[in-house]
């Protein structure tokens, strides 16, 4: 009944991944992002992650695998997903949703920390505001975007962009793959110092 559609969906997902992988720059950027985060941890820094909708879930997933574990039993790494419901509702009510992430960074972000911001469009106002505050505080910024990078293009120290223009879900599929690779590389890199 739906076999052709299922195969078409899987094929499109594979095609987007193949296109992403065929650009060597993307492979280098993933390594750069992993080293940036690992170096922050080695210097006593932390990573703060944020995004909206599915990207918010990916930001939480990234943080929990840093504080918990990915594949290896090892010490937890300092990571916070900006996802506290009381904070989000307070700032949304008192200042506006576009400030939910930047306000948190104003409170806890420090020089040497890393902001890991996700936006499939690259145009999420609250992530853009977080990038601005992170830069003002001397933090490093990793952006995971899609399409043409949107307004986030060129703002991050490392931008990993999935140049897919049809649907956000294809971009998110690559984002979660990249997150898992980052976890693997961070565990490799941090094990060197253990």
Swiss-Prot record:
Annotated compartments: Cytoplasm
Free-text comment on the cofactor: Binds 1 zinc ion per subunit.
Keyword terms of this UniProt record: Carbohydrate metabolism, Cytoplasm, Isomerase, Metal-binding, Zinc
GO function term, MF aspect, one: D-sedoheptulose 7-phosphate isomerase activity
Subunit description: Homotetramer.
Family of the protein in this entry: Belongs to the SIS family. GmhA subfamily.
Name of protein: Phosphoheptose isomerase
The species this protein was found in: Actinobacillus pleuropneumoniae serotype 5b (strain L20)
Gene: gmhA
């Amino acid at each position: 009944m739906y076999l052709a559609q299922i195969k078409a969906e899987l094929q499109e997902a594979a095609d987007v991944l193949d296109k992403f992988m065929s650009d060597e720059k993307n492979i280098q950027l993933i390594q750069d992002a992993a080293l940036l985060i690992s170096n922050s941890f080695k210097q006593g820094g932390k990573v703060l992650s944020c995004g909206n909708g599915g990207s918010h879930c990916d930001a939480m997933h990234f943080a929990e695998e840093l504080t918990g574990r990915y594949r290896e039993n090892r010490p937890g790494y300092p990571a916070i997903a900006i996802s506290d419901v009381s904070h989000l509702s307070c700032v949304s009510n008192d200042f506006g949703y576009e400030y939910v992430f930047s306000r948190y960074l104003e409170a806890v972000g420090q020089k040497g920390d890393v902001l890991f911001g996700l936006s499939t469009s690259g145009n999420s106002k609250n992530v853009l505001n977080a990038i601005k505050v992170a830069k003002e505080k001397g933090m490093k910024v990793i952006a995971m975007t899609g399409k043409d990078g949107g307004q986030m293009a060129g703002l991050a120290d490392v931008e990993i962009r999935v140049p897919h223009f049809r649907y956000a879900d294809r971009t998110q599929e690559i984002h979660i793959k990249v997150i898992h690779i980052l976890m693997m590389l961070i565990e490799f890199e941090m094990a060197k110092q253990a």
